[in-house]
Amino acid sequence: MNTVFPDSVIAAFIAKMQKKKVIYYGHSTMEDFKNSFIGSNLAAPIFKKWICFCYNLGDVVVTPTEYSRKLLEGYGLKRKIYSITNGVDTEFFKPDPEGRIRFRAKYQLTEEQKVVISVGHLIGRKGILDFLELARMMPKVQFIWFGGGNESLVTAEIKEAISKKPDNVLFAGFVKSDELRDAYCGADVFSFMSYEETEGIVVLEALACEIPTIVRNIPVYEGWLEDEKQVYKAETIKEFQEKITAIFSRDVRLMKKEERKIACNKSLGKVGEQLLRLYFEME
């Protein structure tokens, strides 16, 4: 079961009636539900109870990281919890010089123009407000945000901030996977300012494409992403500005190799091997 929607719950009950083992994927937590849309903070405690009910329908629970595993253990789940990465398609997401050309042509960017991108829904948790403030602090840099969301669920604060965005910010909306890959290959920095993640699939995609990446220094990255080895980490908007400025002038070739190495260790093939071992354990 891969979602916490009612159809997955029904499917889990049917599987149990048929004496089948159920693996429930624990991608959602109360922590990453908060600050997501209008009313999400009020609904968060109810959401926590619901996902606990869902996850306990599984014989085991699989969650992407050690961080999310510890969160779910703290919920008092009755099932054994395994941490297995979401993984990334490293055959698709990989460095591509032609992708850089396509990206810059599409958005009418010169080869010399510095470009910072981010990817995510237009929600507070993803750091959209900080992204806009960062752009104001770096007016000579082009900032592009990929992703959108249901406009009726976007908070008034974010709508107002977007309406007053600085001129160097472009909201590209949702794009196809190949266009997003071109963006990873064509921009200078991937700035992921999210406050809470269970892993961050877009981070894996960025690492696979070897774009210099800066993330917020939050617990989910502990143990697998090191500051100034595979990524840069920052806490304040000022730190993001300073480190991005430094990236523009640094030789990042060694870091790119480390990025790709991390991504390859989380390739879909590696994920498949881990899942296969789990399946055999359950027999």
Predicted feature descriptions by range:
Residues 174-175, 182-187:
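Short alpha-helical donor nucleotide-sugar binding micro-motif in glycosyltransferases
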Residues 21-23, 31-54:
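Nucleotide-sugar donor phosphate/pyrophosphate-binding loop at the beta->alpha transition
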Residues 195:
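Aromatic "clamp/platform" in nucleotide-sugar-dependent glycosyltransferases that forms part
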Residues 88, 119, 142-157:
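Glycosyltransferase donor-sugar binding loop
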Residues 67, 87:
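Carbohydrate-associated surface elements
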Residues 227-238, 246-251:
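Conserved acidic donor-binding segment of nucleotide-sugar-dependent glycosyltransferases
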